[in-house]
């Protein structure tokens, strides 16, 4: 046979070898695929939870008498295991204890909660039970596995835009256009700084605290309010025109400030000596003192000026002092103006005890520059630094000054054009703080300079506005990016923002693309839960403050309430009785935790349809959720694929319908950084040579580099040097040819662009994207089969996905298998310690599929770390196995595969090829009611003994019983309501005592379509000490197993979006067959390929057939080649004993037909000969699996396909992959050759057993009296308007009348009809539909009267009677309803 050099064999495990056609051979392995949430939750429990709780303490009483202080917290070990939580429908959680103390500062006493009794498990107060995460990243809540989906949101930061809107809480939006910088904090109010389109000065729009409206300020008013003087503002911005015009547009300057109403009035009060009589708030004292200082200084100056010998030096000194006082006054008044406009509370201060020293400016600084109130978060600071640093605006700009280092040496000369090399140098020196470009901000109040020392520096560089003319300069101000630990807003940030805006009209700076992934980040479970915990802690804080305020004697109303309410906590207690428990109520904390895991939008049932669906659920990200995007939002830009998604978010896998583009999947290698930004790995390229150094880049960092695509690996020397002169690479959104020496990085793998599910589709590159999307989504819907087989044509990631799904049992340590049975594997390690691995047996998943694990190792096997020990559902030898390899032909067959219908052979039905197991859980509760307790019993009234034949003596079904719909699973009786007894019943009760109970049957029965075998019973009872909900005495769960064979109406699909419904099951002998007698398994319509453009399925078909033929060839060759025979168990994934028996039996069979050498086998050993030998050992062709891996974007190409077909004995040029087919019914060959091959087909969750449904009678809607809809409500099929037209077209008047009356909403008519059918009478005439009654009532509701006009012209008023009254019924059939106009009515009618 011809050796194909385009492949290599890859061994994934001792039983899995694939012929690998990948072209890129780097050894980069992805991290644990579902791992991102696991690490986030671990960080939350170990670090963040304590930080959040601790940040709210100490809590002090208003007068400082008491304080509640925090001394740490402890999470105890869980009381039950994960397995027990699942089995007993409990939550897998651990108790949180918080150690608090109550300090009385007057007496010095400290009260704590100590661990006094065995009942209290730890020191401190019990706060809540915190659910714990399993190793697989899920939570077990009430016995159900749940998962928290990561949310993708806009990152906090500064954004440069030309259009923006401020959303207000009353559903209004304020739109703004121009040169805009949007400051988007993690916590705090949104701010816009902008130059409007028709204005020439800078303004700021700030949303007020309530979010009701947005206020506009001149930028200089804000800067003054924050503590900058007009002189300093002009100095910082170098007398920029926009800033000068902003100063002119506002009121707060030395000329106009004294004319301000409050100040003018105060001056008049001082002059008239009324100052002492004017009462003022402590917060107003600061500016009033400043006015007083100004008045005194001004008086002194006037006296000097009026004196006969004025001292110029002293006057100059006084002028300086007056200037300082005025500037301080301007700042304070500007701050007051901002605070009042934004409705900022002046009470909610941290420093409450020092009210006399409080000023409006200090409140404003506290509101905007304090993390508790205005938080940028680490992600926001990271974005601020990247956007507002000077280097961001220097690219391709000419420097208008010498840039020197701290020693005075010129690093970059004036006139230098800043290109990548110079910019890299500038960035490096700037980060190291080695450039002499750093300036300091000076506040008017000197104490602020010391308070904000670390954060009031900025960088400044002069550049030319025009690179060519160089006649005008402008300055660029940027933040000092060396300290990224500051998570609050700073004055330097605001100055840098203003600088950015005023330079935008000169095209200095870049606008932001809001859909770029660098501007979005992931909120993982730690952040989502953090916001909920903060809500709970705020409520607890408020409760503690209220209690302490009452105890402090500060709240008279509270004291009165306590006196009036003798049951209140503190009303009956003296302050000496105050304890930690009496001032704290952890209930709000418990509620938010419970709500998060039960009702939060992003907390979902874990999709356990199969291992792939579970894994993709854990890698899903959603743009919806609290503060996210609504699914009704029509914005296509949000949903569209963006170039920055490359390697981070899959461009293929997303739902169809309303959620398209809002729910996404992480790409195969995607990870996240500490700030929540998505990263993807690249290999570093240095001087045209690919190194082994892997770096993970965020979308923003990637924008700085030139990155080559993975196809560049095709021509690489042994040392990693790229041999091509030019290679395809991308820079931001554009692709071009680059010299390898210009390239910075290269992709680690061609599949890094797609998700886990999309990477399972072979020949993905040959499929249309919309079909690939369907293929990726439908693999998640595949039902786990009884006998799964991994695909012959795979992509090489099947083993990795199975391993990371959490359903594959893998060895923790190396060793030897010492014990194996269906439920347990024991491995003895190298240290002679044994480890037991318990296997799941027939467990119901969230999607009612069967999760079962079966061992794939034998006693004596040597085991390596992470080697597969037992397969989970949809797995074979540790590989993902969602479907079956079946022989498919593309041909029509009597029209049965028209419009995507599928014809299958009954072999798939008889041999259980597509059979699956489903487990349904039925639950019944035994309740305590006001009429008495319900009872689970076998003694059920009005039920025959035959109906109770499978119930045990307690009334519960026996395990193993085969049940049909309507059968009783659990017998239960409920007490009837209290009714008056008849004399006869009273007599019987008097004779028999109280034995005759008034009970009714309320048993649990098998619903429609619920036939199966009872597999298990779980009983929970208060009597046995189980925890149940209030008023529940006993809970019984019954598990019924169904084995579902494939049938007409089931949905099947390939991996390329080629889906269809089974329309006919044909006998195997009637199916078309190949010339060697092999019958086809499935017939697909050839018209399903061209328009869908999913040609990948055709490639898979031919490659799969070549693999099947190669398996036969390898088996025959192994009969004459001892070396190959020894390897065959690994090639086929069979047990060694079975492989040896197979070869031995085949050799004997060949001898019986006279074949003794390999040369003789070519024409004499037929398919049927191999089939006979396989059947002797209980095997099928599916067990002869010669597996191939063709990874996405780098797998089998046309040359490889032709080579492997030739190797398998198929002439690709002569046959084109098409074969002569013979009709099984007639024995006649088809007219032309037909494409036949092996395709991997899945049985999907959409099974006809779940959908098929019939109704004779059933429930009706209360209002319309029409039948309900849907299977769950035993509803009918809606006969709509168009269906009515169809009957009208055929003139089927009687059918139509039936459908619109007795089969719909003619209440009396349907009852009479039912009665007639039961008694065998003829069907009566229909009456008036309820919808007509509804119409009359709605018209009467509009104030209109309705009259009935009879044939004899008599009129009857029907406004006070029902139109379906029996006495009217006969007349109405022959009546006409009069039309009316308003003119017909007189006043008496109203």
From Swiss-Prot:
Keyword vocabulary terms for this entry: DNA-directed RNA polymerase, Nucleotidyltransferase, Transcription, Transferase
One Pfam family per UniProt: RNA_pol_Rpb2_45
The EC number(s) this enzyme carries: 2.7.7.6
Region Disordered: start-end pairs: 556-576
Reactions the enzyme catalyzes: RNA(n) + a ribonucleoside 5'-triphosphate = RNA(n+1) + diphosphate
A GO biological-process term: DNA-templated transcription
GO cellular component terms, A-Z: DNA-directed RNA polymerase complex
PROSITE patterns: RNA_POL_BETA (PS01166)
MF annotations from Gene Ontology: DNA binding; DNA-directed RNA polymerase activity; ribonucleoside binding
HAMAP family according to UniProt: RNApol_bact_RpoB
Subunit structure: The RNAP catalytic core consists of 2 alpha, 1 beta, 1 beta' and 1 omega subunit. When a sigma factor is associated with the core the holoenzyme is formed, which can initiate transcription.
Family: Belongs to the RNA polymerase beta chain family.
Function of the molecule: DNA-dependent RNA polymerase catalyzes the transcription of DNA into RNA using the four ribonucleoside triphosphates as substrates.
Annotated protein name in UniProt: DNA-directed RNA polymerase subunit beta
Lineage: Bacteria, Bacillati, Mycoplasmatota, Mycoplasmoidales, Mycoplasmoidaceae
């Amino acid at each position: 046979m011809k050796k194909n050099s385009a492949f290599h064999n890859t061994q994934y495990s001792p039983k899995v070898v694939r012929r690998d056609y990948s072209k890129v051979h780097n050894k980069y392995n992805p991290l644990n695929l579902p791992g991102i949430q696991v690490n986030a939750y671990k960080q939350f429990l170990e670090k963040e939870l304590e930080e959040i709780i601790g940040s709210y303490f100490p809590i002090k009483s208003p007068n400082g008498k008491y304080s509640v202080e925090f001394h740490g917290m402890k999470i105890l070990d869980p009381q039950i295991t994960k397995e027990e939580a699942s089995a007993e429908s409990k939550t897998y959680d651990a108790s949180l204890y918080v150690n608090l103390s109550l300090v009385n500062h007057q007496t010095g006493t400290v009260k704590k909660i100590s661990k006094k009794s065995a009942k209290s498990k730890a020191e401190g107060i019990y706060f809540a039970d915190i659910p714990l995460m399993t190793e697989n990243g899920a939570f077990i809540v009430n016995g159900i596995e749940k998962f928290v989906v990561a949310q993708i949101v806009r990152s906090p930061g500064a954004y440069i835009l030309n259009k923006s809107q401020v959303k207000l809480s009353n559903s209004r939006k304020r739109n703004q256009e121009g040169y805009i910088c949007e400051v988007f904090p993690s916590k705090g109010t949104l701010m816009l700084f902008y130059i409007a389109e028709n204005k020439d000065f800078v303004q700021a729009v700030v949303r007020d605290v309530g979010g009701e409206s947005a206020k506009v300020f001149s930028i200089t008013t804000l800067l003054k309010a924050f503590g900058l003087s007009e002189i300093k503002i002009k100095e910082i911005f170098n007398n920029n025109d926009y800033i000068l015009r902003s100063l002119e547009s506002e009121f707060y300057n030395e000329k106009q400030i004294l004319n301000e109403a409050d100040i003018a009035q105060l001056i008049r009060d001082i002059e008239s000596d009324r100052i002492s009589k004017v009462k003022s708030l402590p917060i107003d004292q600061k500016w009033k003192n400043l006015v007083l200082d100004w008045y005194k200084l001004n008086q002194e100056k006037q006296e000097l000026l009026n004196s006969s010998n004025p001292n110029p030096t002293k006057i100059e000194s006084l002028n300086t002092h007056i200037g300082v006082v005025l500037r301080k006054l301007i700042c304070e008044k500007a701050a007051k103006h901002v605070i009042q406009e934004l409705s900022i509370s002046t009470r909610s201060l941290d420093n409450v005890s020092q009210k006399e020293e409080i000023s409006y400016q200090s409140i404003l600084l506290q509101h905007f520059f304090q993390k508790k109130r205005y938080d940028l978060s680490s992600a926001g600071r990271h974005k601020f630094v990247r956007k507002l640093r000077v280097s961001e605006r220097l690219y391709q700009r000419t420097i208008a000054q010498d840039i020197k280092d701290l020693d005075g040496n010129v690093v970059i000369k004036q006139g230098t054009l800043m290109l990548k090399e110079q910019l890299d140098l500038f960035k490096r020196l700037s980060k190291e703080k080695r450039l002499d470009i750093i300036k300091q901000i000076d506040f008017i109040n000197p104490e602020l300079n010391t308070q904000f020392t670390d954060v009031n520096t900025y960088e400044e560089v002069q550049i030319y506005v025009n690179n060519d003319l160089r006649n005008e300069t402008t300055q660029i101000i940027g933040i000092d990016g060396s300290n990224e630990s500051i998570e609050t807003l700073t004055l330097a940030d605001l100055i840098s923002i203003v600088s950015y805006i005023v330079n935008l009209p000169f095209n200095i700076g870049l606008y932001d693309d809001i859909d770029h992934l660098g501007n979005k980040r992931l909120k993982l479970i730690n952040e989502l839960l953090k916001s909920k915990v903060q809500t709970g802690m705020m409520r607890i804080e408020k409760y503690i403050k209220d209690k302490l305020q009452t105890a402090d004697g500060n709240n008279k109303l509270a004291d009165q309430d306590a006196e009036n309410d003798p049951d209140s906590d503190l009303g009956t207690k003296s302050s000496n009785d105050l304890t930690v428990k009496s001032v704290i109520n952890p209930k709000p904390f418990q509620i938010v935790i419970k709500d998060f895991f039960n009702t939060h939008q992003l907390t979902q049932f874990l999709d356990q349809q199969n291992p792939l669906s579970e894994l993709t659920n854990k890698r899903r990200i959603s743009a919806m959720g609290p503060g996210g995007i609504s699914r009704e939002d029509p914005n296509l830009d949000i949903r569209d694929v963006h170039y920055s998604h490359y390697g981070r978010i899959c461009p293929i896998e997303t739902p169809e319908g309303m959620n398209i583009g809002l729910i996404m999947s992480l790409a195969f290698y995607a990870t996240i950084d500490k700030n929540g930004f998505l990263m993807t790995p690249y290999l570093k390229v240095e001087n045209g040579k690919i190194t082994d150094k892997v770096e993970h880049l965020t979308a923003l960092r990637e924008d700085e580099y030139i990155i080559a695509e993975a196809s560049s690996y095709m021509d690489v020397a042994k040392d990693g040097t790229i041999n091509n002169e030019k290679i395809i690479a991308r820079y931001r959104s554009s692709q071009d040819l680059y010299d390898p020496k210009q390239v910075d990085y290269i992709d680690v793998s061609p599949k890094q662009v797609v998700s886990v599910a999309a990477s399972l589709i072979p020949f993905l590159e040959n499929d249309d994207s919309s079909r690939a999307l369907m293929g990726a989504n439908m693999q998640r819907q595949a039902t786990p089969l009884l006998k799964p087989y991994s695909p012959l044509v795979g992509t090489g990631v099947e083993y990795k996905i199975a391993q990371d799904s959490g359903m594959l049992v893998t060895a923790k340590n190396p060793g030897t298998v010492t014990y194996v049975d269906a439920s347990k594997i024991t491995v003895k390690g190298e240290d002679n310690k044994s480890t037991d691995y318990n296997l799941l047996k027939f467990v119901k998943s969230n999607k009612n599929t069967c999760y079962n694990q079966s061992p794939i190792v034998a006693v004596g096997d040597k085991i390596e770390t992470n080697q597969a020990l037992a397969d989970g559902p949809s797995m074979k030898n540790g590989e993902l196995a969602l479907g079956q390899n079946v022989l498919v032909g593309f041909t029509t067959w009597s029209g049965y595969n028209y419009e995507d219908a599928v014809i299958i052979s009954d072999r798939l039905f008889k041999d259980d090829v597509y059979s699956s197991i489903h487990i349904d859980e039925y639950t019944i509760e035994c309740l305590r009611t006001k009429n008495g307790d319900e009872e689970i019993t076998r003694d059920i009234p009005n039920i025959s003994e035959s109906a109770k034949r499978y119930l045990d003596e307690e009334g519960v079904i026996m395990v193993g019983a085969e049940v049909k719909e309507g059968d009783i699973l659990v017998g239960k009786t409920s007490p009837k309501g209290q009714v008056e007894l008849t004399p006869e019943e009273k007599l019987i009760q008097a004779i028999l005592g109280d034995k005759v109970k008034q009970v009714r049957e309320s048993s649990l029965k098998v619903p429609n379509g619920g036939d199966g075998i009872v597999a298990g019973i779980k009983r929970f009872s208060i009597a046995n000490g189980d925890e149940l909900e209030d008023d529940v005495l006993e809970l019984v769960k019954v598990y019924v197993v169904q084995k579902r064979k494939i049938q007409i109406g089931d949905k099947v699909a390939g991996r390329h979006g080629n889906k269809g419904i089974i329309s006919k099951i044909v006998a195997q002998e009637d199916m078309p067959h190949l010339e060697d007698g092999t019958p086809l398994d499935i017939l697909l319509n050839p018209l399903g390929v061209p328009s869908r453009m999913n040609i990948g399925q055709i490639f898979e078909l031919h490659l799969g057939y070549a693999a099947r033929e190669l398996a036969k060839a390898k088996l025959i060759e192994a009969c004459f080649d001892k070396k190959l025979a020894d390897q065959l168990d690994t090639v086929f994934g069979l047990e060694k004993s079975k492989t040896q028996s197979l070869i031995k039996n085949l050799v004997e069979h060949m001898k019986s037909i006279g074949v003794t050498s390999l040369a003789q086998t070519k024409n004499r050993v037929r398919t049927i000969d191999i089939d006979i030998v396989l059947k002797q050992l209980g095997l099928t062709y599916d067990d002869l699996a010669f597996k191939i891996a063709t990874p996405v974007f780098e797998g089998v190409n046309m040359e490889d396909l032709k080579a492997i077909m030739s190797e398998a004995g198929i002439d690709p040029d002569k046959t084109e992959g098409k074969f002569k087919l013979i009709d099984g019914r007639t024995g006649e060959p088809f007219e032309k050759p037909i494409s036949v091959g092996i395709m991997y087909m899945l049985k999907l969750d959409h099974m006809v057993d779940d959908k098929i449904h019939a109704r004779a009678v059933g429930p009706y809607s209360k209002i319309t009296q029409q039948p309900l809809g849907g299977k769950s409500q035993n509803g009918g099929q809606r006969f709509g308007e168009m269906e009515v037209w169809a009957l009208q077209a055929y003139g089927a008047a009687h059918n139509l009348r039936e459908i619109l009356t007795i089969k719909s909403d003619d209440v009396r008519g349907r009852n009479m009809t039912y009665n007639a059918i039961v008694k065998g009478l003829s069907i009566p005439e229909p009456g008036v539909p309820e919808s007509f009654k509804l119409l009359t009532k709605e018209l009467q509701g509009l104030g209109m009267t309705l009259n009935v006009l009879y044939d004899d012209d008599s009129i009857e008023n029907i406004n006070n009677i029902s139109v379906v009254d029996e006495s009217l019924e006969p007349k109405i059939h022959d009546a006409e309803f009069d039309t009316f106009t308003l003119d017909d009515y007189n006043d008496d009618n109203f």
